[in-house]
């Protein structure tokens, strides 16, 4: 650190130089995040100093968090939506705002483990969870942090988790199952209704990672079942900072009942509240304000239009790609496309180096992974496909 302070002009010149090194979303087709809505940005600024880790000092920010949990509970068909954070909610859905899907997934499995430890089920060995091969890498962190064995079930021909594989991996030490509602690589939705049945039959917890799909699936023309409407679903992760158009970081974790939240409780005797249920201590009240503001501003109608627009982009991409001879691995159910192209690694490299397009690659099979977000336009899609044609004609 410098001895003498710099001027504002020097500081902002320095910051602008750093900002110029960042990638603008203009030609990004690989990210599940996007520009936050302007009202979310303004709300974030208004509550920039609010710390939800000390709720008694920031009652207003705390109330906004409660409202977000309530709105998300309504969206995801929770048993009850009027639940004060940390309050009494014995037969109602509870939750809190997290930094994103990784924290939500960690906390959901931590809750499973704690409830099993204090419950009637006796394990004969290390606890395990069964997840799809398509699950997010955050579950690798779960295994490392908590000493939980992670068993990976294979996928079917449509890149959804295979039910027979799930059932074959369950044993006496299994504490829970994971379902994905919008997997990162293919945008596919696991058969959550079937997972719900298996979870109930085996008395297992079922956590749904809907970090991306949570703000997409409810607004599709033909939504698939994935939320608390299914009786076996015990927790759901959803990220407002993705298709919810809030500021980063803004995630959320909802539980079906208070017992899950209570299993995460630790005493905090020197704060204005007696206990915390969260993973992090200090938490952003600004994120709560941003999420509350954008959800109230857009409403169901606004989010429906947002999803319709992204699905229009998705359809446009598939149509234009077919014109130059490239097919998707499967028909997209969400705004994620896996496109079959020759030598996808080379294509990815060339699209970035020559035209500035940021795309990614699926693992198995290897294909171009493209995410169509609100920052993209129909014109972007036409230009992208023309650039793709120019790159692939040389292979």
Swiss-Prot record:
Record-linked InterPro entries: GrpII_AminoAcid_Decarb (IPR050477), MfnA (IPR020931), PyrdxlP-dep_de-COase (IPR002129), PyrdxlP-dep_Trfase (IPR015424), PyrdxlP-dep_Trfase_major (IPR015421), PyrdxlP-dep_Trfase_small (IPR015422)
One Pfam short name: Pyridoxal_deC
Task: Enumerate the catalysed reactions.
Answer: L-tyrosine + H(+) = tyramine + CO2; L-aspartate + H(+) = beta-alanine + CO2
One GO term under biological process is: methanofuran biosynthetic process
Q: Which Gene3D superfamilies match?
A: Aspartate Aminotransferase, domain 1, Type I PLP-dependent aspartate aminotransferase-like (Major domain)
Identify the EC number(s): 4.1.1.11, 4.1.1.25
Q: Which residues form a coiled coil?
A: none
Q: What is this protein called?
A: Probable L-tyrosine/L-aspartate decarboxylase
What species was this sequence derived from?
A: Methanosarcina acetivorans (strain ATCC 35395 / DSM 2834 / JCM 12185 / C2A)
Q: Which UniProt keywords apply?
A: Decarboxylase, Lyase, Pyridoxal phosphate
Q: Which cofactor does it need?
A: pyridoxal 5'-phosphate
Q: In which pathway does it act?
A: Cofactor biosynthesis; methanofuran biosynthesis; Cofactor biosynthesis; coenzyme A biosynthesis
Gene for this chain: mfnA
């Amino acid at each position: 650190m410098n001895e003498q302070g710099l001027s504002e002009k020097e500081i902002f010149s320095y910051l602008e130089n750093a900002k110029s090194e960042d990638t603008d979303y203009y030609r990004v087709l690989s990210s599940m995040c996007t520009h936050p809505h302007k009202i979310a940005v303004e709300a974030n600024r208004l509550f920039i100093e609010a710390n939800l880790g000390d709720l008694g000092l920031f009652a207003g920010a705390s109330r906004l968090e409660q409202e977000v949990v309530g709105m998300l509970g309504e969206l995801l068909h929770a048993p009850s939506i009027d639940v004060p954070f940390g309050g009494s909610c014995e037969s109602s859905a509870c939750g809190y705002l997290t930094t994103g899907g990784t924290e939500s997934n960690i906390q959901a499995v931590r809750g499973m483990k704690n409830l099993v430890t204090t419950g009637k089920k006796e394990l004969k060995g290390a606890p395990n969870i069964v997840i799809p091969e398509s699950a997010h890498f955050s579950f690798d962190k779960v295994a490392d942090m908590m000493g939980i064995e992670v068993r990976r079930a294979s996928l079917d021909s449509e890149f959804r988790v295979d039910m027979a594989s799930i059932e074959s991996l369950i044993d006496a030490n299994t504490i829970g199952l994971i379902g994905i509602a919008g997997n990162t690589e293919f945008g596919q939705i696991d058969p959550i209704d079937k997972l719900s049945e298996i979870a109930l039959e085996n008395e297992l917890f079922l956590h749904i990672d809907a970090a991306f799909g949570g703000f997409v699936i409810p607004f599709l023309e033909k939504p698939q079942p994935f939320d608390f409407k299914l009786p076996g679903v015990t927790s759901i992760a959803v990220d407002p900072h993705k298709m919810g158009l809030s500021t980063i970081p803004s995630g959320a974790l909802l539980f079906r009942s208070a017992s899950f939240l209570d299993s995460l409780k630790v005493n905090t005797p020197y704060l204005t509240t007696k206990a915390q249920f969260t993973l992090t201590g200090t938490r952003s009240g600004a994120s709560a304000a941003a999420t509350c503001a954008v959800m109230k501003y857009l409403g169901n109608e606004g989010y429906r239009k947002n999803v319709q627009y992204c699905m229009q982009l998705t359809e446009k991409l598939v149509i234009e790609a077919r014109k130059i001879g490239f097919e998707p691995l499967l028909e997209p159910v969400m705004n994620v496309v896996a496109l079959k192209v020759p030598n996808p690694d080379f294509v990815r490299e060339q699209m970035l180096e020559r035209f500035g397009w940021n795309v990614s690659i699926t693992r198995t099979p290897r294909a171009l992974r493209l995410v169509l977000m609100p920052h993209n336009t129909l014109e972007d899609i036409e230009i992208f496909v023309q650039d793709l044609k120019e790159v692939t004609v040389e292979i």
